[in-house]
Amino acid sequence: EALVRREGRPFVVKNPLCSPTSPIHTIVCETPEDTLAWLPRIDDAEGIFLQEYLGRREAGHIALVSDGEIHSLVTNQEYKRAFDGNLGIVAGAPLGGLVERDPGDRYGLARELLEPLRPWFREVGFRGPVQVTAIRHDDRWHVLEYNVRLGVTSGPMIASMLANPLETFGRCALGLPLNPQWRPGKEFGCNL
């Protein structure tokens, strides 16, 4: 609470584990008063951390890294509100998600936030999925988090959009060159 009072700005309250059974996942607070109101009421048995609140223009990008290359798959967005407009803050897990097939990185998330990691991916021999979530603020993307997973909302949608999901994921796990193929007409996915 002292940090919020000293900084005088809102924070997103997050759980570092976020398992399906976690007592909290994310609580988006848009004012310092919201943040201060939530802190004493949170079950912090798994710990919490505060993430700077930068607004609502949030998006994610999911790619596969294999054989030293980054293969963009989709841009995704999680639904964090139960209704259209500002009718309440998020107090729990996302309600669902959208994915857009995006091998060309239409919004620049991979170019700005994943490509700079390519030397590190190669140095350590990383292979697998990588997801970045960011907020667009002051005309640039600001990283909120990186994850090395497809995610429970986006993973099944990506698999259903790919014509060769087993081959693509299998080759990625082995660190082999990838050639993801897309099902015709599968441009978007939605999960509620």
Regions found by a protein language model. Give the residues of each.
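A short glycine-/small-residue-rich loop at the edge of a beta-strand within enzyme catalytic domains
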Residues: 153, 157-161, 182-183
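Short, active-site-adjacent cap segments at secondary-structure transitions
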Residues: 18-21, 137, 191
